Amino acid sequence: MNAFPPPSTLLFLPCSATKNRPLHPVFPGAGRRLLTTLVNSAGALRDGRHGLAACVDWQSPDFAALDYYDGALYQVPGLRGAVAAAMRSGAIDVLILSGGYGAVYADEWIHKYEKQMDFAYWRRHGLSAVLEEWIELSGARTVYGFLARTTAYGRIVRAVDWARVRRGGRVAEAGLFALNFPGREGAQSRVPPALGRAVVDFIGSGFDKAQLLAREYEGHRFICEELGA
């Protein structure tokens, strides 16, 4: 099973509807399982996954989530390699918010499923509490999400009790990076690859927030919504 050093930064990424067998997986070995990490919120996550079991193709091959998801964000050149290398170095740990699984480690193995992220469903099943416990257990100092602002993913991350997380004393900064894209026309095709490139650039810059916010992606810049400040 994969073992990584304690991370200094946590990232949240969205899943993708497209899932394909990886040709060159970055996590070919057995991955971690979020359910075995959690203590207080494990039951809620388990129940949430059980309620969506019919959406999962249990006969499909399973692969690490970072390798399996193959939408526009995950097709950005260098994204998988950059994320995997940063995880192995202890720079980051990554949770992918998943419509079928709630949340999974980037190296956690999953089956193919057909289920969009449903904010109401996962709110009832305590997904925000799952994220909160994971943050606290990690001991990380900074937490960022790379998510579209108006999606269910963003709403789930905002629903975390960030004031309580910060009062715990470990998290010094938490933010939600989103492309400042006006309107919805063209967003579905342009925002995901911009998010992927931003993740690669953020890791490559040594997590330089100012540098990321100064760059343009698809003709627009990112904004960072502070969480719990």
Where are these regions (language model features)?
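Peripheral peptide segments
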Residues: M1-A229
